[in-house]
Every structure is written in structure tokens, then in C-alpha cells.
């Protein structure tokens, strides 16, 4: 079933629901074999947005049948204490995935913390071993947002072989892993950013545009060739007419006149990020129990 509605709107909520259904089915398969997938979520401090994100992740895990373990630490937690918790979770065979909610308080070294997570339990896909493996085209735990974007593209376009993709943005969380995933899918990939010359002209050549640069409504119809497929990763809060609203990096109404398919903001990429966190937790559990040999739909659909 395609994730494209009308023929233009890519429905991220519907696609995410399908991914979560796959995960739920595979959780049952693993549980029948005595494996109970578990995700540990670590939150340091009381940032309201982070609390909402953690709550949503825990809720989705429970809906899929994944056991969730919340570790809420005060904002003044010492880095050494946080690292000690991570080492404890690494050693706990009943925990298959570890997620440390970002951002961390300023006194904690984010890189040191993320690199302390066992790569096989790194469900965010941020560990250097997973980043390097992805760049080499290996099957590793992959950052959730770009993995979700790839699934939307595959649902919308089918085989991506030979397509020219332009990724706007070079972040370690989205831009770089997105480019690596598209290369693995046999696309020709260009990575552009705010310092790129002829940015608009480069985008006009693309069959696929992934916008992940954090600039509200940067990309409009004039940036697109007719029939392009557009994935908008941007989430920008702006004030418009005295009201606060969320918009993407793409001028949606303008781009809709030229794109063959496009994700909305909200309701496009966002739901896929949490869905792929659940999928990564499932895959992590499977990777930590390779002897089972169980066929799982989440492994048959790796993106």
C-alpha cells in the first residue's frame, strides 16, 4: 500500500502506523521465543519539551509491547553518575535499547555519553561504530529520522535506483546519514547546505529533495523540477498573524504546485521518527539474540 494521498500528500501518520504494526507483530514473535524487547530511556533534567518527547516514546513502546524503563535524573546529575548508569544498562542483558534524551545539561559532555552506549543497544544510531558502519553501507542501527524518510520515499517512489537526490543540510543527525542511506539505495546523491553555491539550481535538478536545514519555508516551487518528491524534515515555530505555528523548511503551498508528492509539517516525517525508534529497539533485540533465526518483518523491510 502506498503512503501517498491525493496524489500529492505523503501521509506520515499512516506510514508510521504500518511500521508500528510490523514491530508489534515481531515483538509477539520474539516474546514467543522467550525474548522480551526492552527500551531504557534516560532523561536528565526537567525540560518540558524533553518530557513530552520521552512520554510519547514510552507510550509508543507500550503500545507495541516493548517494555520501557524510564530513568529520570535531576539536572545537576554528575556526568560520572550518568555514565555509570549507562554502563549498568549496557551490562543488563534484559535491556536491548538505550536512549539518552537530548539535549543534556551544559556540564555533561554529550559526545562522551553517546559513545558510552553499547553500539548494539544504540537505538538512536549515534555511536561512532554505527555511523561508520552506515557510511560503509553495512546493516547497522541507523538514526531514526533519516531511516523514516527513506521508508516514506520507498513507499512513495518504489525502487530508488538511479534517482538523483539532493539533501539540504549536513547535520550528523539527519543530513549525513540521509545521504548515506540514499547512496545505499543506489541513488546519485548531492549534499548541499547554506554555504553551497547555486543552491537553488542544484535542487532544480533533483528527482528527490530532502530538506533538513532548519530555515522556515526556504524551499519553494522555484527550487523544484516538475514531478520532484519532497521530504520536509524541518520543524520551525514561527509567529504569523499574531499566532504561533509550525512550518517546515519547505513552503508547502508553493511546492505543492510542482511536486509529485510532499510531506506536510506536522504529520509527515515526525510520526516516522518515533516509529523507527521502536523498530530500532526491535532490531537491537534481534541482533543481541542472533541464534534464534526468527524471520521478522522488520528485518525484511530494513529501511
Swiss-Prot record:
SUPFAM superfamilies: Aminoacid dehydrogenase-like, N-terminal domain (SSF53223), NAD(P)-binding Rossmann-fold domains (SSF51735). Gene3D superfamilies: Leucine Dehydrogenase, chain A, domain 1, NAD(P)-binding Rossmann-like Domain. One of its GO terms (biological process) is purine nucleotide biosynthetic process. The keyword NADP applies. It comes from the Bacteria. Its EC number is 1.5.1.5, 3.5.4.9. GO terms for molecular function: methenyltetrahydrofolate cyclohydrolase activity; methylenetetrahydrofolate dehydrogenase (NADP+) activity. InterPro entries: Aminoacid_DH-like_N_sf, NAD(P)-bd_dom_sf, THF_DH/CycHdrlase, THF_DH/CycHdrlase_cat_dom, THF_DH/CycHdrlase_CS, THF_DH/CycHdrlase_NAD-bd_dom. One of its GO terms (cellular component) is cytosol. The keyword Transit peptide does not apply. Keywords: Amino-acid biosynthesis, Histidine biosynthesis, Hydrolase, Methionine biosynthesis, Multifunctional enzyme, NADP, One-carbon metabolism, Oxidoreductase, Purine biosynthesis. NADP(+) binds at residues 169-171, 194, 235. It catalyses: (6R)-5,10-methylene-5,6,7,8-tetrahydrofolate + NADP(+) = (6R)-5,10-methenyltetrahydrofolate + NADPH; (6R)-5,10-methenyltetrahydrofolate + H2O = (6R)-10-formyltetrahydrofolate + H(+). Pathway: One-carbon metabolism; tetrahydrofolate interconversion. Belongs to the tetrahydrofolate dehydrogenase/cyclohydrolase family. PANTHER family: C-1-TETRAHYDROFOLATE SYNTHASE, CYTOPLASMIC, C-1-TETRAHYDROFOLATE SYNTHASE, CYTOPLASMIC-RELATED. Homodimer. This is Bifunctional protein FolD 2. It comes from Ectopseudomonas mendocina (strain ymp) (Pseudomonas mendocina).
